[in-house]
Amino acid sequence: MVTLGDLKTPKTNTWCPGCGNFGILMAFKKALIDLGIEREDAVLVSGIGCHGKMVNYVNINGFHGIHGRALPLATGIKLANHNLTVVGFAGDADQYNEGWGHFAHAVRLNLDMTLIVHDNMVLGLTTGQATSTSQQGFKSKSTPFGVIPPMLNPLAHALVSNGTFVARGFSGDMLHLKGLIVQAIKHRGFAFIDVFQPCVSFNYLNTYDWFRNRVYKLEEENHDITDRKKALEKAFEWGDRIPIGIFYNKERPTYYDNLPHIKDEKLTKLPTENVDITSTINEMT
């Protein structure tokens, strides 16, 4: 059985003191322990941003990709070996800006993996520019007069793209977030969690206290997680009360279920000896 000690790495953590990433890191580690997933059976993929250092701080197989491209990497890994537990980590700018096209199609295809987005509503690694989820009026280095367009709603987009598991967490409530991650990894299909992750250095608006005074848990209000329309209504709640928890959870066939050549056997186990691709190469040259 894997332990916290097993998941520790020798890398020095360089996140700012009080960063919301710490709550996500611990929630993820504890979720792996609760699920009994061995290190060799899991792969972590990340993009560019403060969140990207997750691959340095969890002692499992990892791939630190380029900006916005965690999902294509995760897709390839899962296609090659569908027995692996594949978890992608991204930031709000990373996934909802450069990686937006990948996000929409990963949800639609129902790829069997988990995506956890560290949503601090600001570009932290580059010292404080606005992102797609920054609130209107938010003043930053890139928007000195305030953000003009309305903020992107990733949960609503996931729901209308026929997402099968859509959730939101808060890194200030680590135990609740751990439970969401456990359920997401258990889900057979594309599981998406947007996590409110306060940036203590550059987001002066969306602080820990700001979230604590507003968030409430859907499970405490008897929310029906199988009702997509109700989930969509909840996704648009924003203001004095903001819901967290599982908005929607209803399985449907995954993308891999319709690929007969990998349905029963993983690609990494298929024989490659005596394979001649000369004719294929000739057709393309």
Regions found by a protein language model. Name each.
Residues 46, 50-123:
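Thiamine diphosphate
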Residues 48-50, 120-122, 173, 196-202, ...:
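Glycine-rich beta-alpha junction loops
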Residues 4-66:
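Active-site diphosphate/adenylate-binding microenvironment
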Residues 1, 10, 199-285:
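Flexible, low-complexity linker and terminal segments
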Residues 129-136, 174, 181-190, 203-218, ...:
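Short, surface-exposed, charged loop/turn segments at secondary-structure junctions
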Residues 94-97, 169-178, 223-228:
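Active-site glycine- and acidic-residue-rich loops that bind
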Residues 11, 38-42, 80-86, 108-113, ...:
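Short coil/turn connectors at secondary-structure junctions
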